[in-house]
Amino acid sequence: MASNKVSFFLVLCLCVLSTAEFGEAQILTGIKCPDPNGHDKEDKCNIYCLNQNYMGGSCQGYKNHYMCECYVG
């Protein structure tokens, strides 16, 4: 019975760690992505973030509400 609890705890920890996006904090820029579906075809968001001395960026959000987010670390 104890081994089942330990196994469950380890699986739970792995699930949390896999969704944590290690080393990737995201900074909201307030810049709306041009495509309503969040596709940064011209790489404008990434270029903006690189020019602001971040590690890059991408469009994050949901339909018609995608915003540019820059990556840190």
UniProtKB/Swiss-Prot annotation:
Residues 1-25 form the signal peptide. It comes from the Eukaryota. GO terms for biological process: defense response to fungus; killing of cells of another organism. The keyword Signal applies. One of its GO terms (cellular component) is extracellular region. Keywords: Antimicrobial, Disulfide bond, Fungicide, Plant defense, Secreted, Signal. Disulfide bonds join C33-C59, C45-C68, C49-C70. It is found in: Secreted. Belongs to the DEFL family. This is Defensin-like protein 34. It comes from Arabidopsis thaliana.
